[in-house]
Amino acid sequence: MYRIIRKEQFSPRVFLFEVEAPLIAKARKAGHFVIVRTDPHGERIPLTISQADKQRGTITLVVQAVGVSTNKLAHMEVGDELADVVGPLGKATPIERFGTVVCAGGGVGIAPLLPIAQALKAAGNRVITVLAGRSRELIILEDEMRKVSDELIVMTDDGSYGRKGLVTEGIASVIEAEKVDRCFAIGPAVMMKFVCLLTKKHEIPTDVSLNTIMVDGTGMCGACRVTVGGQTRFVCVDGPEFDGHQVDFDEMLQRMRAFKPEEEEAMSDYQHHFDHLDTPPAPPAEAAPVQTVESRVEAVETTPSESDPAAEALNGSRDDAWRKALRTSLKPKERMAIPRVEMEELAPEIRAHELRMEVNRGLSVEQAQREASRCLDCANPGCVNGCPVKIDIPHFVKCIESGRFQAANQVLRATSTLPAVCGRVCPQEKQCESQCIHHKTGSAPVAVGYLERFAADYARLHPVAASADVPERGEAKGKVAVVGSGPAGLSFAGTMCQRGYDVTVFEALHEIGGVLKYGIPEFRLPNAVVDHEIQTLRESGVRFVKDCIVGKTISIEALEQEGYEGVFVASGAGLPNFMGIPGENATGILSSNEYLTRVNLMDASSALSDTPAPEGRHVVVVGGGNTAMDSVRTALRLGAETATVVYRRSETEMPARVEEVKHAREEGVRFLTLHNPVRYITDEAGHVRQVELQEMRLGEPDASGRRRPEPIEGAITRLDADLVIVSIGVSPNPIVPHAVKGLELGRKGTIAVDDHMQSSIPMLFAGGDIVRGGATVILAMGDGKRAAECMDEWLSERKG
């Protein structure tokens, strides 16, 4: 799809590639960049777009081979295809008629400077270009730059070409000769730093384009954060261009060295292999797969017979003979007396070292049927009211009790797109199970989540037909789009497909699944489970498009022009939240989004992956939610000697599921509650070494109903840490909200919707984190289902 059609070599390590990417070529403006992946194991690397040809549908990238991923790219040839190209990303360069403008480019920074110089010249500016490099071979695109410049100066460190000297000397000569109104500088961070020191002295406004560490490139991970004017900014969404006089270059340089040891080791291994081969090295052999819950179940579980057809159970009601007979087979007191099932778990001493072995092992047939027999099949089931997607819980539970396991799965899928997912990660104890009638007698509720997982897993592992999981599709109605493939988007897609719509899901990342893939570790939610649910949607008719950012690659207006009658925005979590305390941008401090994305989506802990994994001996995770538990438990599995959760309230107020806290503690996680970070202490290299903590006490309840934490004056302590993972929530993804004119926004940048999930733009509906600011999987799914129902009604009314 992203085929290389031209390659040029400027120097031993600098290459130009022209790549087919028609949508990006059409949308690209000066200043934009893309994220590129060479192969399935490749790192996501940011590259600024040098040129674009809308007619040919191509973009031009200039690359310097410095690490494994860029060396892999350098070894690709015309005709080869890149695995992924995502963009255009970032903000376009603000172009005005400034007057006299100096464009200063160093090394490969000349490539992204070219379209800026072209745009400045077209806007009527006098453009003076200063190109700089260590030697002549690093002066690239000179002829192209000369065409758009009124004057061009070449500087080389060694004097091998042009004038001998640094880029700042060339700029200084221009400043001495005439008045300069603006400066644009792109190149190595050190170069830009000294250019800005010079121009600040002369009070010349200066824009710099920053190329920082990135993972996703859409703002979700926070790896690209920099300090600008004393505030934390995200290069991929707020930049890449900033006021150079406000940038903390020293901090940026420290952060860019975050993975230098890992990168040097990886490059050494790559070069060692390459020196002994005529072609780039093949990836190492796959390690033997760990035993998954699927292989264990398939090895020991047999398929019980289902004497009654699934259709009878699926289409029935509480008053059907089979359910009446089931209810009378045991007295209510007998059902209430059965103890709640305990699911088998991997032993803590084993699972704490297994990143991809699922902790909860599932129920056996006997366990599932016995647990299902605890359900009283209530006439007015509170559990259904507690379910955000309104699953007919008694119905599917009774199907399990009677041995109709396939029917149980079909009952689930009639209202839920992701039953195998929800059965694993949804907080049933706060939703359906919290409304169970068992609570009235003081006994434990029916294990609805365990049973939901059992039914979905059983159907997946014992398929009776190719379309067993595919719900019946309604009469063809129209064409709708979904932005994002997380739980809200998938739920919407499944529901609309059932109702007869042609559904296309646009996903920014290279994997479908959103937070289900990048955010939740496999020891809680195996990828195979998510992939099966996605495949079920594909088989039902849902189309998926990866590497496409609605609002960047393609606009809402363009979707409407292509015949999409409605758009559901489920773009999910955007910018990770940070506390804004001293030292927070130090090396070794990451957001949970970045940490989990590296490990889960990019498989950074694998020898096959080019993405470096953040590792620490003493890991501190700040926060008390499920994402914090996922992060701290992952850190243990990657070899941390100590893993500590720091939370400002008590354990009672923790939003994480009780089960997740229990599992974390069993695995050796330490909990330091009623403490809050106030400062990070670093070494001379800028790497975090300690967390300074303020001891807290609980005061009166706040708006959330939880008691407000208050600092205890003078109670300060320190905790050793060489890796800190900040997990204190997220802000909505800003790309779509900022890309749609006239779209009404809510508090903190969420999309404002009415009770029907409809925004101020009638064709645009929204749900999940982009509306709530933060939601569980099942709440997001509930939004998706509700939005689908309402959009269907709205579209039907429009058509009469």
Task: Give residue spans per PLM region.
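Feature captures the FAD/FMN-dependent oxidoreductase FAD-binding
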Residues: 474, 479-483, 531-581, 679-692, ...
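Ferredoxin-type iron-sulfur electron-transfer modules and their immediate structural context
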Residues: 240, 248-296, 300, 306-474, ...
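Ferredoxin-reductase
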Residues: 1-80
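FNR/FR-type flavoprotein reductase catalytic core
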Residues: 68-215
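Glycine-rich dinucleotide-binding loop and its adjacent helix/turn
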Residues: 455-474, 532-552, 576-638, 745-760
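FAD-site-proximal beta/loop scaffold in flavoenzymes
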Residues: 585-616, 701-774
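N-terminal Rossmann-like FAD-binding beta1-loop-alpha1 element of flavoenzymes
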Residues: 480-504, 629-636
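Rossmann-like dinucleotide-binding cores of NAD(P)H-dependent redox enzymes
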Residues: 134-143, 502-505, 509-540, 544, ...
